[in-house]
Design a protein with these regions (language model features):
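Short, hydrophobic/aromatic-rich segments at coil-to-beta transitions
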Residues: 55-57, 87-92
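Short coil-to-beta-strand transition motifs
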Residues: 96-101, 131-132
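Structural motif
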Residues: 75-76, 90
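Catalytic Cys-His active-site segments of thiol-dependent hydrolases/isopeptidases
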Residues: 113-119
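Short, positionally conserved secondary-structure boundary motifs
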Residues: 1-68, 99-100, 107, 111, ...
Length: 146
């Protein structure tokens, strides 16, 4: 999976925070709350919610289908944190043999691999490739077609 664009994270001014009602729900329920239901209004700042360390965060837009099994699809926007130490199971953005890629870091039989979330792509053994980790994916922003 390669990239289209890398965007630096910049704090969003508080004036751009959007109001949202505090509504608690369960997965599987959909719809709107009763208009008569009391709720407390709050402000939601997506930058505050998604970006934990602004100085170490960047965004990258995904192209390709290699990570679909992990819920990362073509066109998704990834929030990547450079300050997180990579561990097995993390989704990484890495420079692999001169190409930017997004893969899941795994240890298989004591050897490090970068793995796709699509069975069409074989795991990549890191002992055979030059690899530089750029960061760990913290969040995925996925837009549904409307």
């Amino acid at each position: 999976m390669s990239h289209d664009t890398i965007f630096a994270a910049a704090p969003v001014p508080p004036s751009l925070a959007l109001p949202y009602p505090l509504i608690l729900g369960r997965a599987g329920l959909a719809g709107f709350p009763s208009p008569a239901q009391d709720y407390e209004g709050r402000l939601l700042d997506l930058n505050e919610h998604l970006v934990k360390r602004p100085a170490a965060t960047f965004f990258i837009k995904v192209t390709g289908d290699s990570m679909e099994g992990f819920g990362i699809h073509d066109g998704d926007l990834l929030v990547v944190d450079r300050s997180i130490e990579p561990r097995p199971g993390h989704i990484l953005v890495a420079m692999l043999e001169g190409e930017l890629t997004v893969k899941r870091y795994a240890i298989i039989d004591t050897h490090p691999f970068l793995c796709s979330g699509n069975p069409r792509y074989a795991p990549i053994p890191l002992v055979q490739h030059e690899c530089q980790v750029w960061g760990v994916v913290r969040s995925v922003i996925h837009e549904y077609p409307v």
